[in-house]
């Protein structure tokens, strides 16, 4: 049975922020591509990072 990619990303919001921004910077054109590659719900990432007061900025392709 294949492991869900969600289990491969950090669950702690601050670690998730760092991981996500690094992936966006180095490998993906936008958040949608990142979420598709990791098979995770975009709304889940957005909500989790909003808990620590970060929002996705399309212009910079980062959570700021």
Language-model region placement:
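Short alpha-helical "recognition helix" segments of helix-turn-helix
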Residues: 34-35
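N-terminal acidic leader/helix
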Residues: 1-25
């Amino acid at each position: 049975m294949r492991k869900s990619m969600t289990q491969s990303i950090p669950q702690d919001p601050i670690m998730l922020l760092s991981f996500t921004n690094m992936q966006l910077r180095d490998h993906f054109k936008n958040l949608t591509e990142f979420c598709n590659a990791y098979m995770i719900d975009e709304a889940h990432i957005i909500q989790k990072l909003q808990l620590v007061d970060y929002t996705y900025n399309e212009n910079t392709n980062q959570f700021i």
